[in-house]
Each structure stands twice: as C-alpha cells, then as structure tokens.
C-alpha cells in the first residue's frame, strides 16, 4: 500500500499497471492491483488499474505512452499465482520502459524476498534496479513485519507515509535476527545448491 502511495506522490499521477495472476495485498490500492475479483469490493473500483499478461511489453508501452501512469508493480515470481515468471528480457525491457516514461517500477518481494530464490531479492537475477521494493513475510520469518526500500532518487519526507504499528521494537529484533541467520547459516547458498538438486531430480519425472 505504501509503495503505491509513494509512487503516486512522486509522480502526481494515479494509474497503476499490474499483471494478470498477480497478488499484491488486501488493502485499498494493493487489492485493486491484485488479479482476483473475489476480494475486490465495489469501493475499490475508484482505483485506475490496467492489467497485462506477464511478458506483454508491447501492451505496457502502449499504456505508458498515455503519460498517466504513476507505477508499474510486478512480482518477478508470482507467488500466489502459481510460481509463474517471465524471461529476463521481459524484466529488463520493463525496467527500461519505466525509465523511458519516468514511471516508478515497484518490485513486490513480499513472497520472494529475503533469500528465498538464492538471491536476496528475486529481481536481482535479472540485473534490474527497481525504484521501490516492498517486503514482508520472510523479513520476520513468521513474525509480522513489513516495509519498503526506496531508491535514492525518491525524496521521501517525514510524515508522508505512516503505519499504526510501525517501528515495533520486537519486530525490528526479529528482522535483525533473520538477517543474521541468513548470513551465519549460509541459507542463500543452501537455496542455490538445493535448487540445482531439485531441478535435476524433477527433470527425471515423466511429464
């Protein structure tokens, strides 16, 4: 929610581009950019959203040319959607389009972040740099905590965004403990090794 709000503040626009089969949350703007009509209430219809198939750069650029888009939000691996992902060429192309049309690129790493892919964030595999990164879930290893990272080009101001339970000391300790465990227990290296093993074994299973 805060990632989308910040993108709107930064660009002074309100339309968002998202992708079919994606999931970004259950609050106002986040649920509006989620491709699931069952959880979108009529009150969310005020949001200006356009959904595209994952990989459709041509469609995205046609929409960006209208100059009314504040953000493109994407999961580099669609968690709830069934682990769908596109090719590196798509993510790099999307990144370039956002730069070309001065649109904020939001990487939703709530499900894929914190080492779950072998990289700290899933977008790193594609060598792109989002403007905003949203994170949660793995951030606290089960303890409720979330946040966003913003590019230095975005000038946030005190009080611009807020959260009722923000700055919780216990949540911060949980987050630090997770970072320590990832480093000390070499969890990302283990993910990389186990991934190669899994792919090797899975490839022997008949289609």
Language-model features, listed with the residues they occupy:
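Conserved N-terminal phosphate-binding loop of PLP-dependent enzymes in the Aspartate aminotransferase
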Residues: 1-207
